[in-house]
Design a protein with these regions (language model features):
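Beta1/beta-strand and adjacent pyrophosphate-binding region of the FAD-binding site
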Residues: 2-14, 177-182
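N-terminal Rossmann-fold NAD(P) dinucleotide-binding loop
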Residues: 17
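Short flexible/disordered coil segments
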Residues: 101-103, 181-184
């Protein structure tokens, strides 16, 4: 099987990676972007900045309706939180922005490769897809834009129920009675 060659290969499809891919393509380079997630946008779009801000906006509106509308002469009977609706709104925002990035990739003819990229030589990347199958590509230039992952504390490992990552916190089914945030 022949190894496909690119001018530029970017490992990571988050804000650094997808912007680099789009710009490189606009400058006339043949570009590949390797991303381990199903969707582009990285931590920021999928499980970080964007979804948390969407939920914060919903929470702020709830607070305004609960405590401050009366100051403006607006009477609202007791507001209630519908967590599934808030999560659905957050998911719709994330999907829309992710679809926008995918559209830009298509428009700019960027080869999107799903999998985990590993540099194995100065111009070669091994890609492992979600089934464990491996392939290789080569590129004159490689950009590493792998972003961030939540870190677990050795003394308090994440269990998905009582100790959760930011990704899991963005999908709570209800508002927790108590919550402690470690890190920022």
């Amino acid at each position: 099987m022949a190894i496909e060659s690119f001018d530029v290969a970017i490992i990571g499809g988050g804000p650094g990676g997808y912007v680099a891919a789009i710009r490189a393509s606009q400058l006339g380079f043949k570009v590949a972007c390797i991303e381990k997630r199903e969707t582009l946008g990285g931590t920021c779009l999928n499980v970080g900045c964007i979804p948390s801000k969407a939920l914060l906006e919903s929470s702020e509106l709830f607070l305004q309706a609960s405590k401050h509308f009366e100051n403006h002469g607006i009477i609202v009977s007791k507001p209630q939180i519908d967590v599934p609706a808030m999560i659905a709104r957050k998911d719709k925002i994330v999907k829309g922005l992710g679809d926008g990035i995918s559209s830009l990739f298509k428009k700019n003819k960027i080869n999107r490769i799903a999998g985990l990229g590993k540099i194995i030589a100065s111009n070669r990347i091994e890609v492992t897809d979600k089934t464990g199958s491996k392939s290789e590509i080569e590129a004159k230039f490689i950009i590493i834009a792998t972003g961030s992952e939540p870190a677990s504390l050795p003394c308090l490992p994440m269990d998905g129920e009582f100790v959760v990552s930011s990704a899991e916190a963005l999908n709570f089914k209800s508002v927790p009675k108590d919550l402690v945030v470690v890190g920022a």
